[in-house]
C-alpha cells in the first residue's frame, strides 16, 4: 500500500498557494524524499496537487488538463466535466488518487470516487495522509496569525510533517498572485 503525501491548498486575499511534501512511502519504507506532487497548469493560472498512487495521479492530471483546455480555462466547468467523465468510466472509478485544484477564484477537492467538493470556507483544503494535520494548522494560522499565504502553507505542511510518519518536511510550493 502506498502512503504518499500531504497536499495543502490555500486561497488567500492576494495569493493562491498549493504545497506538498516530498515523501513517497511503500509500507513502512520511504522510497523517495524529494518527490514533487504539485503542478502549475493552464499557463500557470491553475495549481494542482495529488495524493495517492503516483501512476493513477499522473493519469488524472493528464485527463484534468484536457478538460481544462476544453473548458478554455474555466475551472468550475473543467471540474464538473472531469467528475462526469470519472464517474462514467469503470477504469477511472478504480484509481487510487485524489487531487486539489485551485485558481484565484475557486478551490476544489476531487475525490477518488469522482466527487467534487468545494471547501465550506472556500479557501483551505488538504488531502493525503497528513491532510487533516495540515488542514488544522492552516485553519488556526488563517484565523489567528497575520502571515503571508505561502508562509502559512509551508508552516502548516511542516507541522503535518512533524506529526505524520508518511509526510516529510521537504516542502515545495507554487503561488498564483493577483495581477497588478
From Swiss-Prot:
GO biological process: proteolysis involved in protein catabolic process
Entry GO MF terms: metal ion binding; threonine-type endopeptidase activity
Subcellular location: Cytoplasm
Binding, Na(+): 161, 164, 167
Coiled-coil boundaries: none
One of the Pfam families matching this protein, by short name: Proteasome
Subunit structure: A double ring-shaped homohexamer of HslV is capped on each side by a ring-shaped HslU homohexamer. The assembly of the HslU/HslV complex is dependent on binding of ATP.
Protein name (record): ATP-dependent protease subunit HslV
Organism: Campylobacter curvus (strain 525.92)
